[in-house]
């Protein structure tokens, strides 16, 4: 059986932490920022984690991560 391939788009967007969780960046921070408050923009700089329900899907996309 051939090797499985990682989904390259997902591989660029997620990193695995030491505990095995998947770390991600927040969305909605690239443009149309004038109407967003400084507090909102500051919170968008922080990272987030993939939810438990989505982790199973991500394991299929990233078998070697």
Swiss-Prot record:
Q: Which domain of life is it from?
A: Bacteria
The reply on keyword Ribosomal protein is yes
Q: Which Pfam families does the entry link to?
A: Ribosomal_L35p
Q: State which residue ranges cross the membrane.
A: none
Q: Which InterPro entries match?
A: Ribosomal_bL35 (IPR001706), Ribosomal_bL35-like (IPR021137), Ribosomal_bL35_CS (IPR018265), Ribosomal_bL35_sf (IPR037229)
Ranges for the region named Disordered are 1-25
Q: Does the keyword Lipoprotein apply?
A: no
Q: Which GO terms describe its biological process?
A: translation
Q: Please give the GO cellular component terms listed in this UniProt entry.
A: cytosolic large ribosomal subunit
- Report keywords, A-Z: Ribonucleoprotein, Ribosomal protein
The GO terms describing molecular function are: structural constituent of ribosome
Among NCBIfam families, the record links this protein to: rpmI_bact (TIGR00001)
Please give the family membership noted in the entry.
Belongs to the bacterial ribosomal protein bL35 family.
The protein's name in its UniProt record: Large ribosomal subunit protein bL35
| Taxonomy of the source species | Bacteria, Bacillati, Bacillota, Clostridia, Eubacteriales
Q: Give the gene name.
A: rpmI
